[in-house]
Amino acid sequence: MNMKKLVAAAALALMVVGTQAGAETLRVGSETVYPPFEFLDSNSGKYVGFDIDLIDEVAKRAGFEPQILSMGLDGLIPALMSGSIDVAVSALTITPERAAKVDFTKPYYESGLSIMARKDDASIKGVKDLENKVLCAEIGSSGSVFMSKIKGAKIRTFNSAGEAFLELNNKGREAIVNDKPVNEYFLTQKASANFNLREVPGVLKAENYGFAIRKGDDKLRARLDK
């Protein structure tokens, strides 16, 4: 390689490094045990899923380099409010309760809630059948909020939807209300063959997901909404 080509190659390399170094870090909080939206790929050791792909693309278009920080669902909003993260991306339903504490970007996914019950329990056919039942939920989820309004229901919360599914399968509880896409995805996986679970047909409540940001952070919201 002659000197001119060497200098040109070096200049190009510096431009690439400079571009990467110039990108702002976007601290992204996510509950990374919620497939298909966010989970750890056992082969690559990297976080993957619909939300991960989406925030990666959105962040880079906005001039950010996303940094995924794994945490529990119930810890996302406190982390936002304390400034530990910049944005929460975790199949977060836009609800009045959450909107009182944080702001949301434009909705990016239409979702909804559905019931999971055991195959050997045909008594649960709809939300009315959940009254006075012993139920389980993921802590901090919109499903847990929905169930808290069911007459006579007793609810035990778990750190993840997976733990709640296991409790339901082991007959520790009678049903769970959870995000419909997650319920459906779970039932398509090989691991579900070891579970005696079924999804009750129908959507209990339509929901929208959004990225959560700190109250008043209009600049960040505008960049992410572009």
Label each PLM-derived region with a short phrase.
Residues 52-61, 121, 128-129, 134, ...:
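Extended ligand-binding regions for polar small-molecule ligands
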Residues 75-78, 90-100, 146-149, 174-205:
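A ligand-binding cleft/hinge motif common to bilobed small-molecule-binding domains
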